[in-house]
Design a protein with these regions (language model features):
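N-terminal loops that bind phosphate or other acidic moieties
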Residues: 1-71, 81-82, 86-183
């Protein structure tokens, strides 16, 4: 049930906050969890699976009086899920929030020349956008900008109480974007 899942998210977060670690990791799902485990070598049980409930998980995290500047919140996953928070969609389930594609395209609309922008706008899905941006060599800049917008949105949601790092990956498990906010 949803309430049981949300209770498990609270437990994941409580355990992660109690751990003697410089970071806490949120991932929307198993895919992001596996990616982060591979990227950083962090044990799978140390990665908080927050599913579609990013806002709920962040609210639980905010309740912790021990939010410290020396602990970093890391979000790891696919931009199709994580970029939804840029526009304030904190429940990222497809029935509760729109596709992240328009949000991503809007976030980078002034970065590239018009011809490149038109190529990117032709994408049908976020994964298609990733492939298109890799072909025209704009992927690094595009997804660094998206990761930056995500980290800023989450940092603002947390009232700048802790640094936020974002690691974005494609479905092949390749790191495609990274950003960190410091406050």
């Amino acid at each position: 049930s949803q309430s049981a899942w949300m209770a498990s998210i609270e437990i994941y977060i409580d355990v992660a906050m109690a751990a003697q670690s410089e970071f806490i990791v949120f991932s929307p799902g198993r895919w992001g969890q596996q990616f982060f485990h591979k990227e950083k070598g962090v044990p799978l049980n140390r990665i908080c699976m927050v599913s579609n409930f990013m806002g709920f998980a962040l609210d639980h995290l905010k309740q912790k009086t021990s939010l410290e500047k020396n602990k970093v919140l890391i979000l790891a996953g696919h931009p199709a899920k994580l970029a939804k928070v840029i526009d304030g969609h904190w429940n990222t389930h497809s029935s509760k929030s729109p596709s992240a594609l328009p949000t991503i395209l809007k976030a980078v609309e002034n970065i590239f020349p018009e011809i490149t922008q038109m190529e990117l706008q032709a994408s049908k899905t976020v994964e298609h956008l990733i492939q298109t941006s890799e072909k025209n060599h704009t992927s690094k800049v595009l997804f660094a900008a998206v990761a930056e917008k995500i980290s800023q949105a989450v940092s603002k949601y947390l009232e700048n109480r802790m640094p936020v790092e974002v690691l974005l990956a494609d479905f092949k498990g390749n790191l495609i974007g990274r950003a960190i906010t410091h406050d």
